[in-house]
A protein has these predicted regions:
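Acidic, polar-rich low-complexity tracts and alpha-helical solenoid repeat scaffolds
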Residues: 6, 34-609
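Extended rod-forming repeat segments used as scaffolds/tethers
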Residues: 11, 24-25
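N-terminal signal peptide c-region/cleavage motif recognized by signal peptidases
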Residues: 28-30
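N-terminal amphipathic/hydrophobic targeting modules at extreme N-termini
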Residues: 5, 11-19, 584
Length: 609
């Protein structure tokens, strides 16, 4: 086993002293301590850019700095930038990019930097829940023939434990933890808490009660001790539930502790048969926290745990009130009656009808009621996403009630998750009640385009044109904006077809003229230079224009360029000459003369051939 090798390896380690060594499990290597104590103002500036949200811009700046360096002669500077790069990857949570970057390192980097970077790679893999891959890297480090400072070993061994937890290999995690404590005899609180979590996951609650008996005043220690009391049966579930709520109100309770205590409250309430308290606590757990996760493997809650509790609670209410299964209106009326004073109770009743209702109308009404109430609670949007996108009750998107799908699209777009919004939109064909159908269908098409489904977007736009024989100026402009999105995404044939289809619906001459130009742009991008030249010229001369106004001159210049690319050099020469005659600005005349000179060289080259 890997941990056996660790004990052997300790005996042959060479002791070295590195003053900047980091001991705690997930503390990042300090960027100021490797080469210089004072980081350059340039690095500080780039870090500030990243900290203000422009992570990609910061990384691009680092790319430029490192690209200009001769690594062989400027290794120290290159390493400073590289450490900052990895730090910014961490800041932007770009874990996959980070781990791949380190994996691609070439040999020859200083050992102390290399080992630190590998540690960052392992941490990234653990964050990505790739425990096996992390263990393989640790194994290579441990079995390496190179001698390293023994202070690395406890760091690696702790990560081995973490890797087993990530992979839900709880028995191996316990063995690795036992070996760690046997090797290092650590008495620190952090190590005791880690050991307690692993013992709890392995159903050895009695040992946790004994282990943490002196740590009950420590915030997390008290929480784990409470959980051990619950699972060992040492304390009644109701008492544990009450204690969890009391601890949440303590001045020492930070957001992380409160979140974990809600999980303890949910488990204890469920064990005591307290349905409303269980449902309430589960909502807090599943709504999650922006930057906090429950300890790996310690609790086993899922979306279906809450759905099941909603139904169980609703059935309990219905049985007491003698509601009839199948009389959906009874259940809906009860939900409406209590939704202000008892929202969890109302959500349970709505969930019952939504999942078990006898007809589509009442199921949809229940879904709307459930959704409305859900958005009145903190992190309601997150809970909606979790309940409907990660549940066996809704194995495919089309099983999610339509009002909920509309809502998740809005949530997804608010979080810039266009791919999710696009996937949901493929299952929705009509606009929600009370929403302008044209604008909604247009929005649907745009989501498809931006979400990487250009063909579906084009089909949606084509249907819009078929369903609307005439379009107002405002509708035309919004329609064309989506076609521009399609053109920007380099779908030039689709955008050309749509420009052609909408052209007959346009009455304004100015807009017609502009449309020919945009159509020409698509043909130019497709390298159909003859068609592009024809369309640019049509734009220049549309409805009797002589093409001598600013728009016409611009279009004529494009005509000349397309003719040259189409190898129609004589026509291109004539077009440039016409433009030169009517152009007065010196700078533009210089450009035209340059183009004529290029044409002359091309024609001379052809004549020689």
């Amino acid at each position: 086993m890997l941990t056996d090798k660790l004990s052997y390896f300790k005996k042959r380690v060479v002791r070295k002293y590195y003053p900047f060594f980091v001991l705690s499990l997930f503390i990042f290597y300090p960027t100021s301590s490797f080469a210089e104590d004072i980081i350059s103002s340039h690095i500080q500036e780039i870090r500030t850019i990243a900290e203000n949200g422009a992570v990609s811009l910061a990384l691009q700046s680092i790319d430029e700095q490192q690209h200009e360096l001769d690594v062989k002669n400027n290794l120290t500077t290159w390493l400073e930038w590289e450490r900052e790069r990895l730090s910014i990857y961490q800041l932007g949570q770009r874990w996959q990019v980070l781990q791949q970057r380190v994996a691609d390192y070439e040999e020859g980097l200083p050992e102390i930097f290399y080992l630190w970077a590998k540690q960052q790679q392992v941490d990234a893999l653990l964050t990505l829940k790739k425990g096996l891959q992390a263990r393989q890297i640790l194994q290579n480090l441990i079995w390496s023939e190179k001698e390293v400072d023994e202070k690395w070993l406890p760091l690696w061994q702790k990560r081995i434990i973490k890797s087993y937890l990530v992979d839900n290999e709880i028995a191996d995690a316990l063995l690795a933890a036992q070996r760690y404590y046997q090797d290092y005899r650590s008495t620190g609180i952090d190590d005791r808490l880690l050991r307690a979590r692993i013992l709890l996951i392995n159903k050895r609650e009695e040992e946790v009660v004994e282990l943490l008996m002196q740590d009950t005043k420590h915030p997390e220690g008290g929480m784990l001790y409470l959980l051990a009391q619950l699972r060992s049966g040492e304390r009644p579930p109701r008492k544990v539930y009450q204690s969890a709520l009391r601890q949440m109100r303590g001045e020492w309770a930070d957001e992380k502790l409160k979140y974990m205590l809600w999980a303890v409250a949910a488990e204890s309430a469920k064990r005591s048969g307290d349905r409303p308290s269980t449902a309430n606590a589960l909502e807090f757990v599943l709504a999650g926290h922006k930057n906090i996760e429950l300890p790996e493997g310690l609790f086993s809650f899922s979306s279906d745990t809450l759905w099941d509790m909603y139904i169980e609670y609703a059935l309990y209410i219905g049985n007491k009130a003698q509601f009839l299964i199948g009389n959906d209106q009874q259940w809906l009326n009860a939900a409406v009656k209590v939704q202000k004073k008892a929202p969890v109770k109302a959500r349970s009743l709505y969930a019952m009808v939504m999942l078990k209702g006898q007809n589509e109308d009442t199921r949809l009404r229940a879904a709307k009621g459930f959704l409305n109430l859900m958005h009145k609670r903190k992190r309601g949007a997150q809970l909606v996403m979790k309940l409907f996108l990660k549940s066996d009750y809704f194995k495919t998107i089309d099983l999610i009630p339509t009002p909920i799908r509309y809502d998740i699209v809005k949530i997804a777009l608010s979080r810039s998750n266009v791919e999710l919004a696009s996937n949901l939109m493929t299952t929705i064909k009509s606009a929600p009640d009370g929403v302008d159908s044209y604008q909604w269908q247009l929005r649907r098409a745009r989501i498809f385009v931006l979400g990487g489904k250009p063909k579906k977007g084009s089909e949606a736009l084509t249907r819009l044109l078929e369903e609307n024989k005439t379009l107002t100026q405002k509708k035309l402009e919004s329609f064309l904006q989506v076609v521009f999105d399609l053109q920007t995404s380099k779908e030039h044939e689709l955008s050309f077809q749509l420009f052609s289809a909408v052209l007959p619906k346009i009455e304004e001459v100015k807009l017609q003229r502009e449309l020919y130009y945009w159509m020409a742009d698509s043909k130019k991008a497709q390298q159909d230079y003859v068609s592009a030249a024809r369309l640019y010229l049509r734009s220049a001369l549309h409805t009797g224009n002589n093409g001598l106004d600013p728009w016409g001159k611009t279009a004529r210049y494009q005509v000349a360029e397309m003719l040259a690319k189409a190898d129609l050099l004589q026509d291109a020469h004539a077009m440039y000459q016409q433009l030169l005659k009517i152009t007065k600005e010196p700078a533009r005349r210089a450009v035209l003369k340059h183009e004529l000179q290029k044409l002359w060289l091309l024609r001379e080259s052809e004549e020689k051939e």
